[in-house]
A protein has these predicted regions:
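Extended, solvent-exposed, turn-rich assembly/linker loops in the middle of proteins
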Residues: 149-225
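Glycine-rich loops and low-complexity Gly/Arg-rich segments
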Residues: 65-69, 137, 144, 220-224
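N-terminal alpha-helical "arm" segments
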Residues: 1-41, 325-336
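Sequence/fold signature of self-assembling virion shell proteins
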Residues: 213-336
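A general structural signal for short secondary-structure junctions and capping/turn motifs
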Residues: 31-33, 186-190, 195, 303-306, ...
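Long, contiguous amphipathic alpha-helices that act as assembly "spine/axial" helices in icosahedral shell
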Residues: 81-157, 181, 186-202, 310-318
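Contiguous N-terminal and early-domain "leader" segments and peripheral loops that mark the onset or edge
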Residues: 27-47, 115-150, 277-294
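Assembly/oligomerization interface modules of large self-assembling protein complexes
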Residues: 30-99
Length: 336
């Protein structure tokens, strides 16, 4: 009897798992596009922000030269987390299971496979959050891995959208003017800025300024509201609104490197200024595996059993690339 799960069953399981919370990915890259080829194709089209020319009603309309469109393709590296279904665990009571055990070994096996799939999903989404952070910080993403040549995908964000405050303008200095900085960034972005995302160091510097405190002092009588209390342990925290629609968030998301060191997605004293106008999507190349049926999908889970020695495996494959349609709608600033 074949005890392997078919693709559709595993896809249904992984799709029904409780979602793993991402922040940057969810905020700036909400869309999903799946490709039926292993390569991702995308057009780099610069939005034409020129004014329509005024002409006399008696003069023929003026033809405006179409901006060029560049087709590029990229074959992303596979993410392939893989785990063994430990046969010893099927005989051990699971957390929350009644003393004496109410689950059969087969039921525990199913639960273990679901746990593994949930972990795979988290690991893949955490990698994509890291890719989203790179794109927002630099306008580029570096893709590298075992047996995969290091490649840099450049989305051609304007160099001026990656900034570093210097000298007396740094928020660590008493001479800085953070609200003036925010106004300047808003003028520089391709689209209106509606969100400021700060790491905790940048936010701590931001709220200590008198000009910011004046807004805080008048927050009950104005539309400027900022929460100055400590975070409650969440990886992201809404701090309030400046003016009518500029949301302020603190983000403390992180991952661990191979040495188990904690690495924040946003370096210390970083601010991301942007909005939904980034219009990012999560693109997925097809997984070239006959078991997947050569279908377009975000994640392809599979399991199989080697007979000698008898070992059961669960693996999830994905070939993702976050793509910002409008990279100049976001800026990254080192403020101290």
């Amino acid at each position: 009897m074949d005890r392997n799960y078919d693709t559709d069953t595993l896809v249904e399981v992984i799709g029904g798992l409780e979602p793993f919370e991402t922040f940057l990915l969810s905020l700036f890259f909400p869309g999903v596009i799946t490709f039926e080829t292993s390569s991702i194709s995308f057009d780099k089209v610069s939005e034409d922000m020129r004014l329509a020319p005024f002409v006399s009603p008696l003069v023929a309309g003026k033809v405006m030269k179409q901006l060029g469109s560049e087709m590029r393709t990229f074959k992303p590296a596979y993410l392939k987390p893989k785990d063994v279904v430990d046969p010893e665990r099927v005989f051990v009571r699971r957390p929350g299971e009644q003393i004496g055990g109410t689950l059969s070994p087969e039921q525990r096996r199913n639960a273990i496979i679901a746990d593994i799939l949930a972990d795979h999903r988290k690991r893949i989404l955490r990698r994509m959050e890291h890719m989203a952070a790179q794109i927002l910080l630099t306008g580029k993403v570096v893709v590298e891995g075992e047996d995969y040549p290091t490649q840099e995908v450049d989305f051609y964000r304007s160099p001026g959208n990656t900034l570093a405050l210097t000298g007396a303008t740094r928020w660590s200095e008493s001479t800085a003017k953070p609200l003036d900085d925010v106004e300047s960034w808003a003028a520089q972005a391709e689209a209106p800025i509606t969100t400021l995302i700060m790491d905790r160091h940048a936010y701590r510097n931001f709220v200590r300024f008198e000009e910011v405190q004046k807004l805080l002092d008048g927050r009950r009588n104005s539309r400027s509201e900022l929460e100055t209390g400590p975070d409650t342990g969440r990886l992201y925290s809404y701090k309030g609104t400046l003016g009518s629609d500029l949301e302020v968030w603190v983000y403390s998301g992180y991952y661990r490197d191979e040495a188990k060191q904690k690495i924040p997605f946003l370096p210390p004293n970083t601010v991301i200024a942007g909005s939904a106008a980034v219009d990012g999507v999560r693109a997925y190349g097809a997984i070239i595996d006959s078991s997947a049926g050569y279908r377009a999908m975000e994640m392809f889970p599979k399991n199989w059993i080697n007979q000698d020695p008898a070992v059961e495996y669960v693996m999830t494959q994905s070939a993702p690339l976050p793509i910002p349609r409008h990279p100049d709608a976001a800026l990254a600033i080192t403020v101290a």
